[in-house]
């Protein structure tokens, strides 16, 4: 056996080959679009998120530009006249009512029109609803325009007044001046030039004091009343 501790004069021994070990994808990024399929959907979610952010920013910019161009002002509602010919609560809690209402709707905008697709009027005494009307026809209101609409609430309704509401009613019966709320539910769209907006549903509330017309001795005359508009 040759002496292993002796010198070796043969050909040089090549260095050992490096073995590479795959440890999967490095880093938190997902690379190009072709790598997205193997990225457990993270790339797709990132793209969708970026698209949504871009759309939101563009919509915000568009809304700002529209506002700067058109400078929208709030629509104004007034009850110009109210006529109450009956408002009687019988012992069985049936309320008989007959109320005529006239409204003015003012569009103060110079460049914005309004489509009134639906107007529903409800009558309330305290928190109790006693009547509803949706017989106002839909219409378009142009720039800087005032429109007069009217409706009638008539019929009978079971109402269950609490102690405070019954006390208020007794006071109103004695004075013959009734504290009635008219609430409007609208479906409207705005027109900006050739562009029509999506549908809005503002709520209108009018706090009224209406004299009973059969009583001519109170001397109280209905006063036109501005309504609160809540978009």
From Swiss-Prot:
The keyword Acyltransferase does not apply. It comes from the Eukaryota. InterPro entries: LEA_2 (IPR004864), NDR1-like (IPR044839). Induction: Accumulates upon infection with avirulent Pseudomonas syringae pv. tomato DC3000 (Pst DC3000) carrying avirulence genes avrRpm1, avrRpt2, avrB, or avrRps4 but not with the virulent Pst DC3000. Induced by salicylic acid (SA). Accumulates rapidly in local and systemic tissues after wounding. Triggered by spermine, an inducer of pathogenesis-related (PR) genes. Up-regulated by cucumber mosaic virus (CMV-Y and CMV-B2 strains). The chain crosses the membrane at residues 47-67. GO terms for molecular function: mRNA binding. Its main location: membrane. GO terms for biological process: cellular response to hypoxia; defense response to bacterium; defense response to virus; response to bacterium; response to salicylic acid; response to wounding. Keywords: Cell membrane, Glycoprotein, Membrane, Plant defense, Transmembrane, Transmembrane helix. Expressed in roots, young and senescing leaves, cauline leaves, stems and siliques. May form oligomers or be a component of larger protein complex in plasma membranes. This is NDR1/HIN1-like protein 3. The lineage of its organism: Eukaryota, Viridiplantae, Streptophyta, Embryophyta, Tracheophyta.
